[in-house]
Every structure is written in structure tokens, then in C-alpha cells.
UniProtKB/Swiss-Prot annotation:
Displays ATPase and GTPase activities. The keyword GTP-binding applies. Keywords: ATP-binding, GTP-binding, Nucleotide-binding. It comes from the Bacteria. The lineage of its organism: Bacteria, Pseudomonadati, Pseudomonadota, Gammaproteobacteria, Pasteurellales. This is Nucleotide-binding protein HI_1146. GTP binds at residues 56-59. It comes from Haemophilus influenzae (strain ATCC 51907 / DSM 11121 / KW20 / Rd). GO terms for molecular function: ATP binding; GTP binding; molecular adaptor activity.
Length: 285
């Protein structure tokens, strides 16, 4: 039986994810204690082939050993995939303020901020077992559902999806990144008044960066690094590889380099999505 376990930070979108899986034909169970999972899956395996189970902080054991033991028991008999949903602290605080709901750990007389931090400490052992970590900070409900559908299709196709994204360090490092490359040491078009209003997608900025040997050398060496390890990553039964390229504001250097890397792997026949987080963020403002 295929089992998808949905977990993550409270407010990161577990309910939305579970509904998306239900729409995809999964038999869904919301919030069952982890210790009861082996018994539940034994019962469900008699009538179901695909099950999605949501776990929140209240149903995860404090002991990392107990967690590992339970997951190991399940993996002996079933196909287990764990999806962990993340969002940055400010977004979680805003979502709770908007919904006016209590955080599960607020019952321990903790402030919302303290409850969010405490929860993350509890969840850290589970993150180590996740097959997919999704940062929902900038994802709409529709986009989250689509990413999950892509993940499920990836399970059946056994094909690694590569996401190459640019970002600005001043907005924070993407939480779902597998690799983060810092390009702030490269020549910066920002200091040229004619290039400053443009982005790394525009020809004058691309020409400026392409004219510098160190930029081309960085792109070459980064391609070589990823090319070297990509076959092993593809064999590792994962669905996504997220490569994040960061500069100060996420407008020039990181955008150009992410675009170059993404197009390189597309030309090699890989399934690649290129996204520019800071550019998309600034469009919404």
C-alpha cells in the first residue's frame, strides 16, 4: 500500500494538502497518533491501495528513536513517502493572526511566537525523514495543490524534477532548497545606473555578466558539480531537487545565473522549472 504522510509546521498548509490528496483519490485520515499508525495501516491495507495521513505536533512522539522505529516498521510493509510543509516565521504569525485560531502549543501558555519556535524543535527529527520539503511561504492554495500533484506524478514516473530558483538574501534563504549557492561576490550590475532598473533576464544585464570571466567560471563549475552528483540523486528515489542561487536583492546576478543553469539542464533533457522568487515577490507589491 502507498502511504503519504503529511506533516509540518502548524499553519503551513497541512489541511490544504490533505484535501488535494483526497481530490487525487487518496483515502485520507486526519491527525492520528503516530503510535497507532501500524495498526491503522494493517486495517486499511485490506481495502485501500493509496492512503494519505496527516500528523501534527500533538501526535508525534517526543523521542526521535520512537519516530524512527515506527517509520521503519511501516517501511517494511508499505511504500512510505513523507511530505513536510514549511513556511517562514513571519508568514506563520500572519496566518494565525488572520485566522484568529490558536496554535496547538498555545495551550501550554506559550505566546504565538514561542509556540512556533517550540514546535520547530519538536519537528526537527521528522524533517530528517522527509522525501519532500515544501516551503509554502509564497505559495497560493492552488500552487500548493499543483506542487503536490507534480510530486504524485513524479512517484509514478520515477523522474527527478529540478527546480532552479533565484532569490535575494535580504528576503531570506528558501526553506525548501537542497543546495544554496551564494553569488554575492560576483560583479554587481546594481552599481551601473543604466543597469540598476533592469533584471538578470534582460539582455544588457546578461551581456554585462557574461563579459566577466569569473561569472562564466562560476557557472561552469556549478554545472560540473551538479552534473557529477545528479546521477546519484536520481537513484535516491527523490522527486525534487531544488537549487537556489542567491545574491543581495535577487534581481541581477542570481536571476541571470539561475536562468543559465536551468536552461543548461533543460537542454540536456531534464525536467526543469526555473523560478525567480524575489522578482515574483516584487511584482506582487
Amino acid at each position: 500500500m502507498e502511504i503519504i504522510i503529511i506533516s509540518g509546521r502548524s499553519g503551513a498548509g497541512k489541511s490544504v494538502a490533505l484535501r488535494a490528496l483526497e481530490d487525487a483519490g487518496y483515502y485520507c485520515v486526519d491527525n492520528i497518533p503516530l503510535d497507532l499508525l501500524p495498526q491503522l495501516t494493517d486495517i486499511l491495507s485490506q481495502s485501500q491501495s493509496s492512503v494519505a495521513i496527516s500528523l501534527d505536533i500533538r501526535n508525534i512522539p517526543n523521542s526521535a528513536h520512537s519516530l524512527k522505529q515506527t517509520l521503519s516498521t511501516l517501511q517494511k510493509h508499505h511504500q512510505i513517502k513523507i511530505i513536510f510543509l514549511e513556511a517562514d516565521r513571519a508568514t506563520l504569525i500572519r496566518r494565525y493572526s488572520d485566522s484568529r485560531r490558536l496554535h496547538p502549543l498555545s495551550l501550554k501558555d506559550l505566546s504565538l511566537e514561542a509556540a512556533i519556535d517550540e514546535e520547530y524543535r519538536y519537528l526537527e527529527p521528522l524533517i530528517q525523514h522527509a522525501n519532500l520539503i515544501l516551503d509554502t511561504t509564497h505559495l497560493s492554495t492552488h500552487s500548493l495543490a499543483e506542487r503536490l500533484r507534480e510530486f504524485l506524478r513524479g512517484n509514478s514516473e520515477k523522474e527527478l524534477k529540478i527546480i532552479v530558483e533565484s532569490f535575494g538574501f535580504k528576503y531570506g534563504i528558501p526553506l525548501d532548497a537542497d543546495y544554496v549557492f551564494d553569488v554575492r561576490f560576483l560583479p554587481n550590475p546594481h552599481w551601473d545606473p543604466t543597469l540598476r532598473p533592469m533584471t538578470g533576464l534582460e539582455a544588457p544585464v546578461a551581456e554585462f555578466l557574461n563579459s566577466h570571466t569569473e561569472v562564466n567560471e562560476f557557472i561552469y563549475l556549478t554545472r560540473h558539480y551538479i552534473d557529477t552528483w545528479l546521477p546519484m540523486l536520481e537513484k535516491n528515489n527523490r522527486s525534487y531537487l531544488t537549487i537556489a542561487i542567491g545574491c543581495t536583492g535577487g534581481k541581477h546576478r542570481s536571476v541571470y545565473i539561475a536562468q543559465q543553469l536551468g536552461e543548461y539542464f533543460q537542454a540536456k533533457g531534464k525536467t526543469v522549472k526555473i523560478q525567480h522568487k524575489s522578482l515574483e515577490r516584487n511584482k506582487k507589491i
